[in-house]
Design a protein with these regions (language model features):
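Adenine nucleotide-associated cytosolic modules
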Residues: 1-164
């Protein structure tokens, strides 16, 4: 809500909708132009991925823990050649220990950097009619080494979300 207010102060001619409801597979996202995932738990990420794919929405996902962060733009619902989140990070039946921010800690500047990268990609998605989307790549930021790597992602042809 605060972000909506601040953005509206800067530009009163824009329309921003926020969603403060708990997200589940029945959530209605069809009226949103872009979906931003800033969550820190896998189940939410899988749900957002599924909803974005089914509703043909661009999903701009950011994650961070300790001194590392990652950014990905997912467009599997808009282009069948692109992978989705679950192609790259498949669900497993085995319960593996997951490190989250609360347990592992996080450097504040890392979240700021990844968030800024997400916003930058969102602006390009909305404002530029001809631009080379970064969909299909995973960007890995290492705050300790001060490096950014770009990895080309491959679609899983047996993915239960986007290869059905």
């Amino acid at each position: 809500e605060n972000l909506v207010k601040e953005c509206s102060k800067i530009n009163p001619n824009i329309s921003i909708k926020s969603n403060n409801k708990k997200l589940d597979q029945s959530s209605d996202i069809k009226n949103f132009d872009l979906i931003f995932d800033c969550s820190d738990n896998p189940e939410t990420k899988y749900t957002i991925n599924l909803l974005s794919h089914l509703n043909k929405k661009t999903l701009i996902s950011g994650s961070a823990v300790q001194m590392e962060g990652q950014l990905a733009i997912w467009k599997s619902g808009l282009n069948t050649d692109y992978p989705c989140y679950e192609c790259v990070f498949p669900k497993t039946k085995e319960v593996a220990p997951i490190t989250n921010c609360r347990e592992a800690g996080i450097m504040g500047p890392i979240t700021g950097l990844i968030g800024s990268m997400q916003v930058n990609e969102g602006i390009k998605e909305i404002a530029l009619t001809t631009y080379d989307s970064r969909a299909g790549y995973l960007f890995l930021y290492d705050g300790l080494a001060q490096s950014l790597d770009k990895i080309k992602l491959i679609k899983n042809r047996k993915c239960p979300v986007c290869s059905i």
